[in-house]
Regions:
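Polyanionic/metal-chelating signatures
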Residues: 100, 105-250
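A general structural motif
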Residues: 208-209, 228-232, 254-256, 282-291
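Active-site gating loops and adjacent loop-to-helix segments of metal-dependent hydrolytic enzymes
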Residues: 67-94, 135, 150, 155-162, ...
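Hydrophobic faces of well-ordered beta-strands that scaffold small-molecule active sites
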Residues: 55-59, 112-114, 147, 226-228, ...
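Histidine-rich, glycine-flanked metal-binding segment
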Residues: 9, 13-53, 70
Length: 335
């Protein structure tokens, strides 16, 4: 048994406790409160003058998919052979022995969402995981799988500039993405009709399976969310148009210029993972990055989660969150 005493305890869901007590048994929080008796024989940590929080959660990372050291051999997050790869699964790229996992734990982060990068318009599924376990099966949190999609500079740079093929423009991004979703919708309809036919015709032959379309079908049926990478305000609105057109359950990733259209996003009850806040203007679509963005979005009614979009850099999640609070995000919403 471990007892943390005298610290300022941020319970997140039940207010803040000054000089609170946290009891931990076998790696799990057993009790949190003000006047909790300390069991005999418990190891006691005096946290006077310090803040105590639950394990932090990074809502968007690439931890252990883009491994460390950051060399080609460990780079498994972007399958840049086709802009539409919904059948890829982040769990097949994750390295539970990535040394960056231990680095991230030192920052108080115990859970991350990780998965494919943003080179492809549809990059495959990511998932949330606990930072413990020897295999991905032990680490993954069931029910957290989501489909990575991306708009903006990355897909058109990788395929248009790099491979001289579509998409080469933002128009191309939207068109190719829509086309894939429409194909998946048609595939679903065809399979449903085949199943009905099979019930009435004993010797009917089912259509050939298409793993790409099956994977996208899960998104269209709202079984899993679409997490759509978009920085610029116009890309954010394109993501919303397409998501609404196909009735997707979606989250906007990054939402860098979201503050420019915060009222529109708030009215739609958009959910966004915002960040990283500690980034440079390395691309044109990052030109108007603002530390005030998370606070403006949260106050407008957007559901905001802070993200680091990193690997080992995820250890600095508390710093990103602190910057958001300094620039106007309410502390309770930031945590």
């Amino acid at each position: 048994m471990l007892a943390i005493v005298n610290g300022k305890v941020l319970t997140i869901t039940n207010g803040t406790l000054d000089e609170g007590v946290v009891l931990i048994e076998e790696g799990k929080i057993k009790a949190v409160g003000k006047d909790i008796p300390i069991p005999e024989g418990a190891e006691v940590i005096d946290a006077k003058g310090k803040m105590v929080t639950p394990g932090l959660i990074d809502s968007h990372s690439h931890l252990a998919v883009f491994g460390e050291p950051s060399v080609w051999a460990n780079s498994d997050g972007n399958e840049v052979t086709d802009p539409i790869t919904p059948h890829l699964r982040g769990i097949d790229a994750l390295n539970p022995n990535d040394p960056a996992i231990k680095d991230v734990l030192t920052g108080g982060v115990t859970t991350v969402y990780t998965g494919p990068g943003s080179a492809n318009l549809i990059g495959g599924t990511g998932f949330a995981m606990k930072l413990r376990g020897r295999t991905v099966d032990e680490m993954v949190i069931p029910g957290t799988e989501a489909m990575k999609m991306a708009l903006g500079e990355n897909p058109k740079r990788v395929y248009g500039q790099g491979q001289k093929r579509a998409p080469n423009t933002r128009m191309g991004n939207a068109a190719v993405l829509r086309e894939a979703l429409e194909k998946a919708q048609n595939y679903m309809n065809k399979m449903e009709k085949a199943q009905e036919k099979g019930k009435s015709e004993e010797n009917s032959t089912p259509p050939e399976r298409d793993l790409k379309m099956e994977a996208l079908g899960r998104v269209l049926r709202r079984e899993i969310k679409a997490r759509i990478h978009a920085h610029r305000a116009d890309d954010i609105m394109t993501a919303i148009r397409i998501a609404e057109e196909f009735n997707l359950d979606y989250i906007i990733e990054h939402c860098t210029e979201g503050y420019k259209i915060a009222d529109i996003l708030g009215a739609r009850k958009v959910r966004a993972t915002v960040g990283p806040l500690l980034m440079s203007r390395s691309k044109m679509e990052l030109l108007d990055v603002s530390l005030a963005n998370p606070g403006i979005l949260a106050k407008a009614g957007v559901t905001v989660a802070i993200q680091c979009d990193s690997t080992a850099g995820t250890r600095w999640l508390a710093c990103h969150t602190g910057l958001a609070v300094r620039e106007g995000m309410p502390e309770d919403l930031a945590m």
